[in-house]
Structure formats: C-alpha cells, structure tokens
Amino acid sequence: MLRDLFAPAGLVPLLLSSPAAATLLYASSYSGAVTTLNLTLSGTNATQSTLQSLSSSNGCAPSPSWLQLDKANARLFCTDEGLTTNVGTVSSFKTGADGVLEQLAKTETISSPVSAVVFGGKGQGLAIAQYGGSSVSWFDISNPAALTPVKSETFNMSAPGPNPSRQDAPHPHEVFLDPKGQFVLVPDLGADLVRVFAVDGANNLVAVDSLVAAPGSGPRHVEFLVTPEGKTYLYLISELANTVTTYDVAYRENKTLGFTEVFSGSTYGAGASAPAGASAAEIWISSDGKFLTVSSRNDSAFSISNPDTPGEGAQIPSDSLNTFTIDAKTGGLTLLQKFPAGGRIPRQFSVSKAGDLVAVGLQSDSRVVVISRDAASGKLGEILTSAKVDGEVTAVIFDE
C-alpha cells in the first residue's frame, strides 16, 4: 500500500544503533494462531537484535490467512481461510501497547477468504476476497463489536482458463484500495482479470469495468504509485506468469478507471526466466516511489546460514526477494538486487514505515525473519533476526 514518506536517510543508522528500540509485529499461521512478536533492535547496526513471541490468540482459528491493521482505530482484522471447514471467517481484534489482542467480533464469510482491506471515508467498510468461493464480500465495521455483512458478489466463468489446473474458476486473490480511496481492486488469478469496484458511501461497493490481464498470467496482487508529476501507475504481479506489469491509470469522469499497459517484465529481471516451479507472491513499492520489491516462492535461488541457529554453520535453501528501480517517467523497472528471503516460500512480506526493516513470512519454514534495508539505495542488507512460529506462516505485519 502507499505509505508515508520515509524518515531522512541519515536517521536510519540512529535507529539501528539504538540500545533497545522495540517494535511489535503480528504474524498469522495455519496453526490457528495470530502471534504478537516483539522486535528489539540492539547492537551496532542492529546485529544483536532479537525477535520474540509476546502473546498469541486463537480467535482467528482454524486457518488465519491475512492480517489487515486499522492503526487509527487500534483494530486488527484477520481472515480465516477455513481449510478444514466449508466456510471462512473474519475476526476483529483490539490492539494494545502490550501486544495482547482482545477479540471484538467474529463472523462467517464465503469460503476461503485470503485478503481484506478497510475502505470508506471513515474506515467503516471492510472488503474481503474469497479465493475458493469465487467471490468478494464487504462488511459494515462502523461498530467495533460487530462485523455486519453488506453484500457479496460471486463470479463465474464459462470455461477454464489457459492453465486449467489453477484457472478452473474465478479466484479473487486480493482486495486493494486505490490511492484516492475511491476504488477497491481485486486481482483474480482464475479469470485473468483485475476486477474493480467503486466505493459507494461509507461501506458499499459497486462493480465497474475490469482490467483484462494477459491470458494465463494469473493476477495475484497489485500496488499503486503516484509520481511527483501526478501520474498514477498500477503494478500487477502475476503468479502463474511470474511477471510484473505496469499500467498507466486514468480516473474517468464516469467514475471508472482506465488502464493502459506501459511495461511488462519478468519478476527476475530483463531477459531472465523464472526457474521451473517458481511462483510470484508479494509486491511492494517504497513510499518515495523509487523502488519495487517482489517475493518469489519455490526458486531455492540461495543457500544461506540457518537464521534460527546463527553461527552454527548449517545451510538451508532460500527463495528470493528481488528489488527493482522504478522509472517514474515510463513506469518501467530495472533489476537492482536479488536477495535471499530467509527461507522457503516467502508468501508475504511487509516493510516498516521508515523503510529500514523488512519482515518476511516464510510459509514452509514456519519462520519470520527481519532484514535490514537501506531506504536511500533501496537495497536489502542482512538478516538481523528470526523467530519460529507454529504452523505455516501466512502473513506478518508491523504494528504501525
């Protein structure tokens, strides 16, 4: 998502060398738990940092899949994919400085919710993408102790897509709010679409024209960039094709969005193909608009020291985080750096508000790692610390 401006680059070393700078993170996993982690940065360049579990909640069980923080209202939303049931759920929690999550509400959804986003002028709506249920639902969340269904839209396809095993039906994979708060975008992996909904009032959505993606590409997640010159770009990461595609976005008078493709390239850089079996996952753009980072799963591009047992010499395979520089004039991307994600299957990652820390959720290793990042250069530095989390990690976010 678009974030506040970075702190000046000169402030970053001060943060990393502070005696005990503490930050809270939340991690969800298929164990059924949402775990609060305490990150303490200490030592020169944070080389003696620690990441420890503070508390845990099973209120989003059995299969937590996504975390959405509403920091302004001290609320955390969690979707439960319902892997062992026929329905999904969404839960809300009150957050606190001690890291303890107090459950406020929980309600059923259509099956397999995998993403949620708060929308509406006062944050009174919550949209949810339901991958297995081929649908999008939205809720009235104006009452913190209630999650009231407003409406659902279920999608259909007349025939499977070019990749029948993955595109047997529509599979909405994310809900994402545009920079103006006027639209919710829904990448649909199964239908090769980015569905678009206009925000209508405090907690309602209205379907408008969709973006048609390349056949068989499998849209997964999106990010927006607004340039200093006022251009708006949409960046789409596609799981099946392992590509990032840039669209010039136009806000039309009829309250729809127009999309013009201006760039498309591999998640591994110009002229590079994804390794067999690799699949693109997360995408993020720095708030200064200069850098874009993606995670790639199942490429085993690196062999690294086990972050859980530093100094013992054990080596483990690691998938990739690939960073690109952004050409704000054209929307194009140029590969800047390939970096180990800290283990296997980096399903999701988050970046701190200051842009100096990256938290990665490694699904297959049941691990969260924290990596240093130079906000000025855009490059990742080193794995600072890690923590084991019960179950397959599905999301990790900073409490900020």
Placement of each model-derived feature along the sequence:
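Residue position within the beta-strands of beta-propeller blades
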Residues: A27, C78-T79, I128, V186, ...
